[in-house]
Design a protein with these regions (language model features):
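Polar, glycine-rich mid-to-C-terminal structural blocks
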Residues: 1-19, 27
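Function-dense linear segments that define catalytic or interfacial modules
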Residues: 16-120, 125-135
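Short, intrinsically disordered, charge-balanced linker/junction segments flanking boundaries
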Residues: 137-140
Length: 140
């Protein structure tokens, strides 16, 4: 059976529009954006996590590890005036990463190696629509 590339792409885009999935990952673009220091080490990105939030290099020695958390923008007014809120979140994520490094079993040595070398963390956001509703902001 021959499948039209255009029809397949249209189906992917239509499904993405209706469901939010599948997550699309353009690996060439991710590798072009890889920091030069990692390129100089011969590293490359081979994939991402499921939701495409993180793109970290992997190879025979390393398995990507990133500690993620989110702030709830619906509660932005409550935490935005605290200058230490985001730095404290970053420190908390780094502490979680350190706990993993200190307690990881040998069976995940590649993940421990990556966590130790890169210390990747990420702070995302959720609740933007709820914040706009709370503030009475019309949005189309």
């Amino acid at each position: 059976m021959i499948v039209s590339a255009r029809k397949l792409w249209e189906t992917v885009l239509e499904t993405r529009y209706r469901t939010g999935e599948p997550y699309l990952n353009f690996i060439d673009t991710a590798n072009r954006a890889l920091p030069q220091t990692q390129k100089d080490l011969g590293l490359k990105i081979n994939g991402s996590n499921l939701c495409n939030e993180i793109h970290l290099p992997t190879n025979e020695e390393r398995t990507a590890v990133c500690c993620l958390s989110s702030v709830n923008l619906e509660n932005y007014d409550a935490w935005s005036k605290d200058p230490m809120f985001l730095p404290d979140m970053a420190e908390m994520l780094d502490n979680v990463l350190q706990f993993f490094i200190d307690n990881a079993p040998d069976t995940v040595a590649r993940a421990k190696y990556s966590a130790t070398r890169e210390r990747s963390i990420g702070i995302g956001a959720l609740g933007f629509h709820a914040y706009l509703q709370k503030k009475g902001v019309a949005w189309e």
